[in-house]
Amino acid sequence: MERLAIREIIKAVQGELICGSQRGEILGVSIDSRTIKKGEIFFALKGERFDGHDFIQKAIDKGATAAVVSRKKIVATKIAIIKVSHTLTALQELAKFYRQKFNPVVVGVTGSNGKTTTKDMLQALLSSKYTVTATLGNYNNIVGLPLTLFEISPKTEFLILEMGTNHAGEIKRLAEISLPQMGVITNIGATHLQFFRCISNVLSAKMELVQLLPRRGKVALNIDDTHLRSQFKKIKQKIITFGTDPQADVLANNIVISRPGEKERLSFTVCVGRDRKEFDLYCLGRYNIYNALAAISVAKEFGISLSLMADVLGKFKFPKLRMEKLEYGEVTIVNDAYNANPTSVKAVLSEFVSSFPSRRKIVVLGDMLELGRISRKFHQEIGKIVATSPIYSLIAIGEDARFIAQAARNCGMEGDNIFYFKDKKVASRKLKELLKPKDAVLIKGSRKMGLEEIMKYLS
């Protein structure tokens, strides 16, 4: 981060200096007193289970130069204390101010599934030619995205921002802060329905990104997604379509999936106009072709050749917890515990079954969270799929995961092979009892379930 004068910060956040001096400058921004560094400004954010105001003294002790607060009564100190109405809004406004000091090409990436992988692929492609700053991990929300903006430097030519949401208006706010010139929407699925209520509202939330793009902006959209396709005529910006539909601007065909027992590989031809190039992705999950196409759709707009892109993606290392293949003795475990929603679980189950046709298969499935009133229905749908697939055993973990187990039993799966637990440590012991050499195991659940810990319990 480039240095910022405290007087600039006061103006940007429309704050009131209630302690200390407006002279001086800050070297960075922090919201965590545990990791704050000397010279940084501390934003005292409030959450459901914490209040940053309780940690101001700790931040000062670690060398904070200034703090942004929403309380008048603060510990006596010599550092600059800036009072605002809402500290989160102030963080966002400062990020917007800082973003406007630079002129990178900003690309926003959103969608129900595949955001992080698409963002990482695009970062790899653009980094082959440009200096790129991108969202760290999955810092994709109304707190994380502003923190990413502070990573911009004068050398940044491209800024790639993952944009997540579980409420209407959030992506609009993220776009207002970051000012993207190009957008990507990977797909639309049944996510966060506890808040969105229906898929049409999910679509509307994702389309907020397009609405905030400039008239001369560009947007890459999945042509195979019927929800997105319904929006094409409403969009004023240039649309770049990707998918397997022959009408796609960036088309994948000749798709070949490696045979069971071979090294995992997805081979396909990418067609852009008259250009053709063979691509290889070394991973499980056919849906990763769509993630690659989304990234290619953006990179081609900025002069990256298909030949160079094929080379870069052929070396791409996929993020952990996404169809991550692990060996546990003679057992193969596919760890896809990063997150889960009905669309992604159905896709992963299909990939898992087809990838291990001759193996005895066990699936460990956790809750799909934030589905609201129809959560039971969606979990039951997954149970039916498990029961009608060549899966030996099901271990369901959580609260609503019990509906997966119940539906699997009701649809004819052998009851002795169905297990339900609320505790993942207990579930791990049962999994360990079941395992036999050459078994294949799938682990998948929502992020808050933390099912990757099963690997720790197994060992």
Question: Where in the sequence are the language-model features?
Answer:
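N-terminal leader/targeting and accessory segments in enzymes
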Residues: 1-93, 97, 284, 355-356, ...
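Acidic, Mg2+-coordinating active-site environments of NTP-dependent enzymes
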Residues: 7-8, 12, 70-77, 184-332, ...
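Phosphate-binding loop of NTP-binding sites
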Residues: 7-11, 89-223, 227-236, 299, ...
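Active-site beta-alpha connecting loops in nucleotide-dependent enzymes
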Residues: 49, 319, 337-413
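Short acidic-hydrophobic, aromatic-tinged amphipathic segments that line or gate anion-handling sites
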Residues: 82-86, 417-423, 427
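Short beta-strands and strand-loop turn motifs
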Residues: 104-110, 184-189, 222, 292, ...
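ATP-dependent carboxylate/acyl-activation modules
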Residues: 109, 320-324, 448-454
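Short amphipathic alpha-helix with an adjacent loop that forms part of the alpha/beta core around
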Residues: 427-434
